[in-house]
């Protein structure tokens, strides 16, 4: 089983960290499901491939045909992000310190998860060099389909990712898609995720609604060692209870991590861009 935020929450013995990891996984379906790969450096170099090599049978004693696989070298730079969960001392007087800090930390962690998810999808590489899935597609690593919503359009974008693991869209788009395919005589099915969550599915690919995705876009991702993932330098998420600061009347918890999305081959990601959320005419 691949390392994810969902699986990691059961692997750490740190109570604070376990709670924060659990909040991240609960807040973001993307972070709950995406496979995480730990690396030892903030720079990571790899090659993306354009196609899989085709092999043929040969007679005994014959040599094998050597077919070159086109590849593109990519260098990713992991970027550091974090936040402080601060509780001023004056808020604590007469209250429960632990409860107040827990509440603030949960809110800050939810914000951390939402911001990280948004960057994983849409960071354009200009801000600190962090490149999201949308930019990978713009750079030619992935497939873009521009069509009105229809059953065939959904099939096309899902088929562009042969081993698709997940579909992401916001709730407005999901309602439009569900309405459109229903008029064509189709409905969504249901599947259970590795985390035990029952979700809608299209062609047995899990659908995760998230308000991070723009109104007119649908992303399809493959989660595997040769597909999409998230690089992490160090721990999946680092948490430090700094206690009451010496120079400020503040109780502080620090939440941080170093990340970079990765797409290892073109067939691992696709996006359906729907003009003005129109549905296809029958």
Q: Model-predicted segments: where are they?
A:
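Glycine-centered loop/turn motifs
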Residues: 60-64, 215-218
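Residues forming anionic-ligand binding surfaces in small-molecule and nucleic-acid pockets
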Residues: 81-90
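Sec-exported extracytoplasmic/periplasmic mature domains
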Residues: 109-117
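Sequence/fold signature of self-assembling virion shell proteins
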Residues: 2-51, 70-81, 95-98, 131-155, ...
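Solvent-exposed, polar/charged alpha-helical surfaces in well-ordered, non-transmembrane soluble domains
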Residues: 102, 106, 110, 151-155
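Short, glycine/acidic-rich hinge or "gate" loops at secondary-structure transitions
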Residues: 117-132
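Extended, non-catalytic structural segments that build the interaction scaffolds
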Residues: 56-57, 91-98, 103
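Conserved hydrophobic ligand-interaction patch in extracellular adhesion modules
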Residues: 167-170
């Amino acid at each position: 089983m691949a390392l994810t935020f969902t699986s990691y929450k059961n692997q750490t013995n740190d109570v604070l960290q376990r709670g924060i990891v659990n909040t991240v996984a609960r807040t973001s379906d993307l972070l709950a499901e995406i496979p995480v790969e730990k690396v030892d450096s903030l720079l990571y170099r790899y090659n993306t491939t354009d196609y899989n090599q085709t092999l043929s049978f040969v007679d005994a004693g014959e040599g094998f045909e050597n077919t070159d696989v086109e590849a593109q070298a990519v260098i990713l730079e992991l970027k550091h992000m974090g936040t402080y969960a601060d509780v001023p001392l004056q808020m604590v007087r007469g209250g429960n310190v632990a409860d107040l800090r827990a509440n603030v930390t949960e809110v800050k962690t939810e914000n951390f998860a939402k911001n990280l998810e948004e960057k994983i999808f849409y960071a354009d590489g200009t801000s600190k060099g962090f490149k999201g899935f949308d930019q990978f597609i713009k750079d030619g690593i992935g497939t873009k389909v521009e069509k009105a919503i229809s059953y065939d359009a959904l099939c096309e974008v899902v088929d562009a990712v042969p081993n698709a693991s997940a579909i992401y869209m916001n709730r407005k788009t999901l309602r439009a898609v569900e309405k459109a395919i229903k008029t064509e005589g189709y409905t969504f099915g249901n599947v259970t995720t590795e985390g035990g969550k029952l979700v809608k599915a299209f062609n047995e690919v899990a659908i995760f609604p998230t308000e991070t995705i723009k109104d007119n876009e649908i992303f399809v991702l493959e989660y595997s060692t040769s597909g999409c993932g998230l690089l992490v330098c160090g721990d999946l998420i680092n948490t430090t209870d700094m206690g009451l600061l010496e120079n400020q009347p503040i109780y502080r918890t620090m939440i941080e991590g170093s990340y970079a999305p990765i797409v290892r081959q073109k067939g691992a990601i696709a996006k359906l861009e729907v003009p003005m959320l129109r549905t296809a005419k029958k």
